[in-house]
């Protein structure tokens, strides 16, 4: 029974705990939800509720006076906010991800999720944010149960085909430019490189770990799933690709041991066919029989 309850915890089958709060840290029913919202007492992730106020939040693409807004100005406004927030929160420790929702529903609009490397860093930031204001509005911060943003983000939105629009109950993460992301998160990579010079063994982030971070954290992503899949299949990833490369190396080394200039393979230099192999083996057998008969 305990194993069954553990397996369905935080899923739609769980009739006790709210799956949306467990995955996203927010629920459209709020305190009126019929299921439990288990608020963590400690977490590496903080939720700053409704903190980002987009200039076109009343009507998308139009300001409060009804004038159309240039999309570039909207993005510039967002990136200024993103950088301000990153610089302030970065004082408390290393930030692994900073995600800002582009949703329009009341329980999601402007939500900011900041994930620190350590829980005590998040606790220090939470304490410092108590009673603080931003742009004349109080900052409402609390620990969030979200630690894996793959379960919280909307995959259809990342592929530009979410039919629920801004009122989707999964996170529509607004992305920053590559230059700003490199500027802010690149400082951690530089510190890793500096630290690795003083140690005999480098502890810098490997390409595989970087791919894992990109999948886990949407703020490190600036292209769609289709683009990412192209990169995935181009470079290979995971256990299958490693097994495939090992098998190819093994086959290649075996082929080098067996091949000789006199008895080369197929004319095209490629892998021999089964008929060619059989013909070559029959030729070897005939040569061996002729030698044995001659010796007799």
From Swiss-Prot:
One GO term of the cellular component aspect?
Answer: U2AF complex
Q: Where is the composition biased (Basic and acidic residues)?
A: 209-254, 272-296
Cellular location(s):
Nucleus speckle
UniProt-annotated stretches for the region Disordered: 191-296
User: Known SMART domains for this protein?
Assistant: RRM_1, ZnF_C3H1
- Where does it mainly reside? nucleus
ZnF (C3H1-type) residues: 12-40, 148-175
**Claim: Hydrolase is one of the keywords in the record:** no
> Start and end of every RRM domain?
44-146
Keywords on this record? DNA-binding, Metal-binding, mRNA processing, mRNA splicing, Nucleus, Repeat, RNA-binding, Spliceosome, Zinc, Zinc-finger
Compositional bias segments (type: Basic residues): 191-202
User: Entry's CDD domains?
Assistant: RRM_U2AF35B (cd12539)
- Gene Ontology BP annotations: mRNA splicing, via spliceosome; photoperiodism, flowering
Give one GO term, molecular function aspect. Answer: RNA binding
| Function comment | Necessary for the splicing of pre-mRNA. Probably active at the 3' splice sites.
Family statement: Belongs to the splicing factor SR family.
Record's subunit section: Component of the spliceosome. Homo- and heterodimer. Interacts with U2AF35B, RNU1 and SR45.
Q: What is this protein called?
A: Splicing factor U2af small subunit A
Which species expresses this protein natively?
Answer: Arabidopsis thaliana (Mouse-ear cress)
Source organism phylogeny = Eukaryota, Viridiplantae, Streptophyta, Embryophyta, Tracheophyta
